[in-house]
């Protein structure tokens, strides 16, 4: 969480900026996730998020090459096994480290110059069948979500391990010494836990776990894509690793894909049936 500003009875003060620079080492899928987060905080609305912007400007990223896939990764299916929006890249060998420096601020190393291509995986242990398009109204009350009512326990571990989850809530903390003074915090939140969609009057938009799973799943492969042109999920597989109930987001994507194919088949059968009935009717009238 982060403090946004402090307030008194008649004024507020923006929290002091942390001036330290940050160097983040991450994988290609995570670098693609940073791009998604940038879209949310910097390309989503009339203005950039002030607090995210000032932190982002002081952060540099080093992509670590992947020589092999991890068990639950499906980055190849999501098209995120490669990245090019980094400040530096690194390949780790047995007795050496190979570097590519793109940001001159990081050009503090010496060594032999070589041709550099970052390591990346070209095949995961499994492929994910993604839907080409999603009919939200059709999927909204689809029976596939019912199983998650009992399977999901709403712990939120999938969200907290996800590099593209950006939801947050606001908390006003009032000081004991003076109830009219305090601070406003932005706190990372989970759309899967109880209370996230609570509103005044004791109501909640998504009470059942299946409804929350639907929201998360479709946000990753439909809502975000509709706005920004690419899937939000980067296929890192961490949510599958973290889930105590062994719920797989990749399996949820495939269920959506199957449901959409079933819908298309039903529409095709209905269309053919209507044409046959119409042709038979016209023939009788002759």
Summary of predicted features, one role per range:
Residues 152-163:
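Oxyanion-binding "anion nests"
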Residues 30, 158, 239:
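A generic "binding-loop/recognition-motif" signal
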Residues 130-150, 168-286:
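Ferredoxin-type iron-sulfur electron-transfer modules in oxidoreductases and energy-metabolism complexes
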Residues 26, 31, 164-170:
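Hydrophobic/aromatic-rich, well-ordered segments within soluble, folded domains that form packed cores
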Residues 1-137, 145, 269, 274-275:
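Iron-sulfur-associated redox domains of electron-transfer enzymes in respiratory
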Residues 32-33, 161, 242:
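Hydrophobic positions within alpha-helical membrane elements
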